[in-house]
Amino acid sequence: MTSLRFDLANVGFAEGERYERARPGYPPGAIAALCAACGITPGRTVLDLAAGTGKLTRELVACGAQVMAVEPVAGMREQLAAGLPGIQIVQGTAERIGLDDASVDVVMVGQAFHWFDGPAALQEIHRVLVPGGAIGLVWNVMDRRVGWVERVQELIHRHRGPNPWYAGHAWRAAFTAQCGFAELQHRVVTNAQPVDVAGLIDRVASISFIATLPDEERSVLMNEVRHIVAEELPGQARFAIPYVTDIFWSHRMG
């Protein structure tokens, strides 16, 4: 992660409590598919890289794996430690993981690879993986095929600027024939997050570049989100945010 990206993430994701509250978990089908593809079984050593508040970490622990977590943002590490006091948590980044060579069987990354310096991160992931070890990537993405979601996403996109984002797919450029990993595989699982208006507002506010907006600008944006809900979902106290969960995996070569 470049210093500029780290600074943005460190500020934008500082409110670990909001992130934990607002972001959805991963659907069981996505976790099962990733565990099968990456060979995650009881006793295997798995690194959750850029673990955040531990949403993916908890799923990996439930699979019976020996899980450790690397996370650069202090607020995220605090939430992670509170929820999973028994696991090893290391302050580090994807480009400087801080573990020994060939020390883990699988590296998992949830909602984060697009933040990394891709080539440098893959080189470091290659280093800490055992020969033939696996990398798994997962993202929960709001389903823009739904009309009201598309309107909310357009509002969000106005404020994105040069910030890294998954849907732009620039992150995939790191997976070249020379990157040390086999061809990236992909699968899609659908998901939904039940919320009320306050929950949707929290979800939007948990986005790094939204969290760093000036208070007045952020307040205007949130009122626009409320207006969309009132227009598109009239009278619905609770509703579901539809998601597409994208999972990717590959294996270390050499």
Name each model feature, range by range.
Residues 45-47, 53-96:
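Class I SAM-dependent methyltransferase SAM/SAH-binding core
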Residues 116-124:
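A short, conserved alpha-helix within the catalytic core of class I
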Residues 95-106:
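A short acidic, Gly/Pro-enriched loop at the edge of an enzyme's catalytic core
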Residues 126-195:
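Conserved catalytic/acceptor-binding region of the Class I
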Residues 43-44, 102:
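Nucleotide donor/acceptor-binding cores
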Residues 109-110, 118:
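A short beta-strand submotif of the Rossmann-like class I SAM-dependent methyltransferase core
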Residues 173-254:
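Conserved Class I S-adenosyl-L-methionine
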Residues 1-41, 55:
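Conserved class I S-adenosyl-L-methionine
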